[in-house]
């Protein structure tokens, strides 16, 4: 089924599923997926997971074709233990598995970490865990990023709060 203005095809619904635009009939170019939903962000670690009580775990996503946009807020009411780099697990889709093609995004807000607060989000190809990156010194312009570790988690109530968003391509 096609949709036209005057004599020009603007959109087509393919028999096998998906939409094409502006006269394109190739299935490979069809937009074949559009969805939105929720996901549950959870603090984890690359070496051993900390013991965490989450007070806020909100995650939303929109997926159009292979493009995914996620947003989230995660906050703890208690945290202890664990080891290694602190990550946020539970992404709804893994980024495309292309070597050296990382997804990254800003952190809109972070608070109540013990020493350094995370400033950037980083996701490795084909991974569903978001790394929390901070500057490597107290200089806010220091470009050398270092992962937040489980030792940065505060055990205070309403602590370790992160609000962020991330866009990436998935398979």
Write out the residue ranges for each language-model feature.
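Trimeric beta-solenoid/beta-helix "fiber body" segments of extracellular/virion adhesins
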Residues: 1-33, 47, 80-82, 98, ...
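Extended Gly/Ser/Thr-rich low-complexity repeat segments
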Residues: 5, 82-94, 139-167
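Generic beta-strand structural signal
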Residues: 13, 63, 123-125
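Enriched but not universal
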Residues: 18-23, 165-171
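Terminal (often C-terminal
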Residues: 21-65
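Beta-rich globular "head" domains
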Residues: 54-118, 163-170
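Structured beta-strand segments within beta-sheet-rich domains
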Residues: 113-154
